[in-house]
């Protein structure tokens, strides 16, 4: 059976919307989503770990959307760098280069990268538990190879569409910092490539 993986950051309507992955929209009016089966979806994020639809409905549990999770992560890890870069821009009288953390989330070069994993087709696929196990082992190997240079922000096991699949958002930890420094783009590319080579080697 074929394993399919698709990576991307944006489509024709802009950067991928995290609300699609954690189903923070009216699924009743979506043609390709079964609203009843949507309650079986499993979600994970880097701050709380695993959650489900029932977890969301529990008033005693903190409920954060993937959109909020990704925003929190970006503010926690990149706000200081954004502010420092903006200060340098102002010092050199290039305030037109200033950005906000929210700008990073909306930009298709600095937003989280999304990967979709699927085994099989609508006609034939593996049980959701098998898919989750295989992808978990893949994540573990990914972590062993790239370590702290990459960070998984959130993922969802979708059981409410034609074929079970996992949608995951990740962030190359140093890539946003490198992308912000426009005055040394060539040096940034060299540094980024060096980081990747160190991770793989």
Name each region found by the language model:
Residues 1-201:
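N-terminal nicking endonuclease/strand-transfer module with a His-rich metal-binding environment
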């Amino acid at each position: 059976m074929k394993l399919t993986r698709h990576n991307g950051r944006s489509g024709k309507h802009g950067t991928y919307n995290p609300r699609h992955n954690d189903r923070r929209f009216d699924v009743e009016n979506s043609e390709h989503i079964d609203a009843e089966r949507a309650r079986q979806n499993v979600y994970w994020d880097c701050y709380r770990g695993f959650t489900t639809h029932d977890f969301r409905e529990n008033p005693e549990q903190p409920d954060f959307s993937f959109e909020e999770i990704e925003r929190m992560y970006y503010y926690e890890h990149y706000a200081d760098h954004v502010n420092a870069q903006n200060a340098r821009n102002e010092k050199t009288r290039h305030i037109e280069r200033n950005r906000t953390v929210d700008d990073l989330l909306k930009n298709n070069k600095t937003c989280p990268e999304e990967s979709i994993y699927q085994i099989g087709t609508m006609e034939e696929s593996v049980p959701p538990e098998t898919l989750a196990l295989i992808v978990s082992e893949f994540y573990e190997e990914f972590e062993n190879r790239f370590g702290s240079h990459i960070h998984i922000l959130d993922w969802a096991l979708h059981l409410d569409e034609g074929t079970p699949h996992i949608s995951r958002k990740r962030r190359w930890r140093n890539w946003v910092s490198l992308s912000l420094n426009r005055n040394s783009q060539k040096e940034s590319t060299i540094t980024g490539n060096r980081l990747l080579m160190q991770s793989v080697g």
